[in-house]
Regions:
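Conserved P-loop
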Residues: 1-71, 111-122, 132-135, 154-156, ...
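Sensor-1/coupling segment of RecA-like P-loop NTPase cores
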Residues: 96-118
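Short basic (Lys/Arg) and small-residue
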Residues: 127
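Conserved ATPase-coupling elements of RecA-like P-loop NTPase cores
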Residues: 81-92, 112-117
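Alpha-helical scaffold elements within enzyme catalytic domains, especially in hydrolases
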Residues: 25, 94-95
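Short recognition patches in nucleic-acid-associated and regulatory proteins
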Residues: 136-162
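Walker B catalytic acidic pair
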Residues: 79-81, 107-108
Length: 192
């Protein structure tokens, strides 16, 4: 029986690398996988999903799914699922329930203010299985929050969606997110 999976985690938890490795595992077993991302997410270029570790794969846009013939696909994997609309998540449910194709969606649970993204909210509501992809804060505790860093400080105001990658965000535990404590990062990228 096909299921809808939502695998969420803070930034830098290797969600994208995990998604690409799951694709690899399916393909190693001669299974056909469709990789998907919202068109809004374009930092790696159109139709490319790329992890911070350097893994990459081609993809289609979520906005195209409803017009595609999914016959023959064994799995659909969605990256950056927090950016999906309610209608797009409903279509993922259709793929699972009516077409019998498992869907594995990866994304952030909440934004830098601690509020749900729309796509994540609906995935949390409708997924058959919800799994956390873990990473750690600078202090060594589990990071569950995404801090937006502006001028070396944790931002508390601003638009929900500002695409920028690890130069603008740091994963923190809730205690350090609430305190605005970036520890050794001081607003630098994960690579510094």
């Amino acid at each position: 029986m096909a299921k809808l999976y939502f695998r969420y985690g803070a930034m830098g938890s290797s969600k994208t690398a995990n998604a690409i490795m799951v694709q690899y595992n399916y393909r190693e077993r001669n299974q056909k996988v469709l990789m998907v991302k919202p068109q809004l997410e374009d930092r790696d270029g159109a139709r490319i999903i790329r992890s911070r570790s350097g893994l990459e794969t081609e993809c289609v846009f979520a906005e195209e799914l409803e017009t595609m013939d999914l016959t023959g696909y064994d799995c659909v994997i969605v990256d950056e699922a927090q950016f999906l609309t309610k209608a797009q998540v409903e279509y993922l449910v259709h793929i699972v329930d009516d077409l019998g194709i498992p869907v594995i969606a990866y994304g952030l649970r909440a934004d830098f203010k601690g509020n749900f993204f729309k796509g994540s909210m609906w995935l949390m509501a409708w997924a058959d299985t919800i799994e956390e992809v873990k990473t750690i804060c600078w202090c060594g505790k589990k990071a569950i929050c995404n801090a937006r860093v502006v001028d070396g400080k944790v931002a508390r105001e601003g638009e929900q969606i500002v695409l920028g990658g690890d130069e603008q965000y740091v994963s923190l535990c809730r205690k350090h997110w609430r305190a605005g404590d970036l520890g050794k990062f001081k607003g630098l990228s994960f690579h510094d």
